[in-house]
Structure formats: structure tokens, C-alpha cells
Amino acid sequence: MGYSWRDAAWERDMRVAQGKPLNVLPHLERGSGPSVSAPWQVKIEPGFSSFVGRTQDIRGYVNQLLTHVRSVVPPNALPQTPIYIMATAGMRMLKPEVRQAILLETCRVIREQPFYFDPDVQDYAGADTDTACGGHVRVITGEEEGMLGWLAVNY
């Protein structure tokens, strides 16, 4: 799912200048340009948990997702656009070492792409088996999944 929002400092300054309240969430926008009519989200099947024992197949799967991202993000904005891949319930049910293998391979694939990553972020997950790529690839909690579902429905 993709969202676009204004620079926070600019939004604050604009609200102050116009006498608008600061305690209101900013409006999320679809952005501009020729890609504005493209859908903001894409879901492909099966989920990440289906790659148990076959992490070598993750590249093609992730590339399907990234092809969609490239259709809505202008090419000149890719290096400033962070990518986050958030896995849900199916991945939470897997053994920690299996989750970690899938997350790490997903991290390796997206690190090869032209998107923004903090240069200090390492590919490894360390002791945390639910996160890789400094949080760019992770298994979200049930609470986070519910919150993001609410956002998707309401925005």
C-alpha cells in the first residue's frame, strides 16, 4: 500500500501561517503525475509464509510487488522512497528460524533495488527473528495488522 504526504515541517509552517490547528492529522494524498490513477495497493498470492524451504523463489515474488511500486512512484523519486514489506499472520505462525530465512532473503532482494535505505542498516536480523533490513522487512504483530487494516479501510 502506498501513501503520499507533505513534508512535516512545511505542513506545520503552512498551518501556523493559516491559523489552522496543529493537532489534526494531515490529509494523506495520492500524489500527482501520470501514475495517480494506478491503484495504491497490490496483493499477490500466496503469502510469504508459502516460501518455507524455497527461499530461492522469493526474488520473483518480491519483484512482482516492486513492479507495482515502480508503476506509481516516479523514477526520479525511487532513491528517496523507502520500501517496507510487512508480513502478517501466516509468517507469525512459522518457526523463528524459518521466518528469519524468509525475511533475510527478502531483504537481500529489495536491497538490490534503487529504493532508499539507511546506509548504516545491515541485512542481518541478529537475535530478532521478526525483523530484517533495519525494519524495512518484518513480521508485524496482530495489533499492527489491525491498525494498518483500519488505515487501509479509512484512508
Describe these PLM feature segments:
Residues 1-3:
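A short acidic Gly-Thr/Ser loop motif
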Residues 6-155:
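Nucleotide/phosphate-binding catalytic cleft detector across ATP-hydrolyzing
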